[in-house]
Amino acid sequence: SRGLGDVYKRQIVNGAQPIDQFVFHDADNDEYYMYYGGWKHCNMVRLNKDFTGLIPFEDGTIYKEVTPKDYVEGPFMFKKNGKYYFMGSEGGWTGPDYKVAYAISDSPFGPFNRIGEVLRQNFDMANGAGHHSIMHVPNSEDYYIVYHRRPAGVKTRDHRETCSEKMTFNEEGLINPVEITTEGVEA
């Protein structure tokens, strides 16, 4: 197996900037996959069980590009009711179009069908709402999105605050759009 350092050596594979690593455990086959990438490209690699190396896929490759339509950076994956939800940021992280969108597949390898936006900016409250993670309360239907944003009127690119909102699904399993609030989630 190859070492994880290979991913971090500024090696550009499939056009993916080596940033924003996210590890996903697929409980169905007890495999660990790492998704990563910026510059509008996302790769996945297969990790060994102690996370010290990469394992080739069945076809002998180490990297697979799994980029959904309009993806820019910040991959996140979760599984719900047999479907793989791939989420990522779109637009420019300092611009007015930065947002979180998602795609769904029947496989952790894709292809991922872009469904729509989950979180977008509300310029009266904040901008730069994008890069995120999802928290799921085990054995429940409670999901939360945690993300960063800049307060309204702040122009400094690195002045960000961490926020969280409840995330819900409709009857078909699609994610309902999340509204940015100043309250966050209930304690």
Please provide the spans of the model-predicted regions.
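Surface loop/turn motifs at the tips and blade-to-blade linkers of beta-strand repeat domains
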Residues: 12-15, 65-69, 124-125
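Short, small-residue-biased leader/transition segments that mark boundaries at the very start
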Residues: 1-8
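Structural motif
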Residues: 41-48, 95-102, 154-164
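Loop/turn-rich, solvent-exposed surfaces of beta-rich toroidal or solenoidal domains
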Residues: 70-113, 119
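Beta-propeller fold recognition
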Residues: 153-187
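Hydrophobic core segments of beta-strands in well-ordered, beta-rich domains
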Residues: 13, 20-45, 75-92, 135, ...
